[in-house]
C-alpha cells in the first residue's frame, strides 16, 4: 500500500516548496502554500491519518469550503526543510460540515499548526472558486525579491504595476491578462489582510503585498508557480532597466492590444489605457 508521503499532492508540495526556496523566494519561515484537494485524493491514505485528529476553530465561518480537504504548509516552518520531513512541515486538514473549523488529519506533528496566513488563503480560495468556477485550487504566498523591490520605486496601483510588468516581458500579458492587484501595507496574519487579499483575488490571480511579497492563484501547483515565476522574471528585468537609467523604448499600447488579440485574452483595461 502506498504511503501518503508518496502521494501526488505531498510530492507536489515538496517540489513547489523546494523550488521556491531555491529561487530565493522563501527565506527562513517566509511564505506559505495551500492546495485544495478532493475527498478521493485523500481517501486511499486514511490508514496514515492521526488516530485522534486535532480540531481548530476558524476565526470566521467558511461554508463554501465545508467538507473540503487541503494540504497546507505549517506555521513557522522552513520551506527548505519540507523535503527533509514532510510530516513535520506539511499537514492535510479537512474543513468540517458547517465550515466552522478543521481537523488535522495528517502531518503537522509535534502540535504544529497551519500557516498563520491561513485566513488569507481560505478567503482567497473562496473567491477563486467563484471567479474560476472551481478551476483554481492553489494559493501560494512567497517573498519574490524583485516584485518586492518594485513596490518601493513604482506607484503602488494596479494599473501602473500591471502595465510595467507587461512591458518587462512579452509573455506577461498572455500569462496574467487580468493584471496584478495590490494592497496598501498591512500587518500580516489577521483576518483584515486576508479579506483585503480575497477582495483583490475576485479580479486578479496575482496580488502584491507592498514591501512584503506576492499571492498567486492557479489550477495546479505547476501553473501557480509558473505564474509567480513569470511575474518575478519581468520584475527582475525592470529592476535592471531602472538601474541602467530607465526605458528608452518599450512595448506600445497598440502592440499590447495586438498581443492580446493574437492569444485570445482580454487585457486589464485600466492598464492598457494608462498611456
Curated annotation (Swiss-Prot):
Pathway per the UniProt entry: Carbohydrate degradation; L-rhamnose degradation; glycerone phosphate from L-rhamnose: step 3/3
Chief location of this protein within or outside the cell: cytoplasm
Keyword terms of this UniProt record: Cytoplasm, Lyase, Metal-binding, Rhamnose metabolism, Zinc
GO terms under cellular component: cytosol
Protein name as annotated: Putative rhamnulose-1-phosphate aldolase
Binding annotation for Zn(2+): 141, 143, 212
Protein family per UniProt: Belongs to the aldolase class II family. RhaD subfamily.
Catalysed reactions listed for this entry: L-rhamnulose 1-phosphate = (S)-lactaldehyde + dihydroxyacetone phosphate
Enzyme class: lyase
Organism expressing this protein natively: Salmonella typhi
Function, as annotated: Catalyzes the reversible cleavage of L-rhamnulose-1-phosphate to dihydroxyacetone phosphate (DHAP) and L-lactaldehyde.
EC number: 4.1.2.19
Residues annotated as the enzyme's active site: 117
Amino acid at each position: 500500500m502506498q504511503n501518503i508521503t508518496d502521494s501526488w499532492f505531498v510530492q507536489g508540495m515538496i517540489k513547489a516548496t523546494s523550488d521556491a526556496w531555491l529561487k530565493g523566494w522563501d527565506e527562513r519561515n517566509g511564505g506559505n502554500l495551500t492546495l485544495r484537494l478532493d475527498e478521493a485524493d485523500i481517501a486511499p491514505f486514511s490508514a496514515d491519518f492521526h488516530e485522534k485528529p486535532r480540531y481548530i476553530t476558524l476565526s470566521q465561518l467558511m461554508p463554501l469550503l465545508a467538507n473540503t480537504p487541503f494540504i497546507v504548509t505549517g506555521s513557522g516552518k522552513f520551506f527548505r526543510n519540507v523535503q527533509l520531513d514532510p510530516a513535520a512541515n506539511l499537514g492535510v486538514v479537512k474543513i468540517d460540515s458547517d465550515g466552522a473549523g478543521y481537523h488535522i488529519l495528517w502531518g503537522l506533528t509535534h502540535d504544529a499548526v497551519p500557516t498563520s496566513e491561513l485566513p488569507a488563503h481560505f478567503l482567497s480560495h473562496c473567491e477563486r472558486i467563484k471567479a474560476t468556477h472551481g478551476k483554481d485550487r492553489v494559493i501560494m504566498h512567497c517573498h519574490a525579491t524583485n516584485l518586492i523591490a518594485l513596490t518601493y520605486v513604482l506607484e503602488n496601483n494596479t494599473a501602473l504595476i500591471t502595465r510595467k510588468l507587461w512591458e518587462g516581458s512579452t509573455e506577461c500579458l498572455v500569462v496574467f491578462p487580468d493584471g496584478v492587484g495590490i494592497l496598501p501595507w498591512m500587518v500580516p496574519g489577521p483576518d483584515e489582510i486576508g479579506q483585503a487579499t480575497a477582495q483583490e483575488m475576485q479580479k486578479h490571480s496575482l496580488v502584491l503585498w507592498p514591501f512584503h511579497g506576492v499571492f498567486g492563484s492557479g489550477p495546479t501547483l505547476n501553473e501557480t508557480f509558473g505564474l509567480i515565476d513569470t511575474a518575478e522574471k519581468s520584475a527582475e528585468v525592470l529592476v535592471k532597466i531602472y538601474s541602467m537609467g530607465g526605458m528608452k523604448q518599450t512595448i506600445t499600447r497598440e502592440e499590447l492590444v495586438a498581443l492580446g488579440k493574437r492569444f485570445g485574452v482580454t487585457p486589464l483595461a485600466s492598464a492598457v489605457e494608462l498611456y
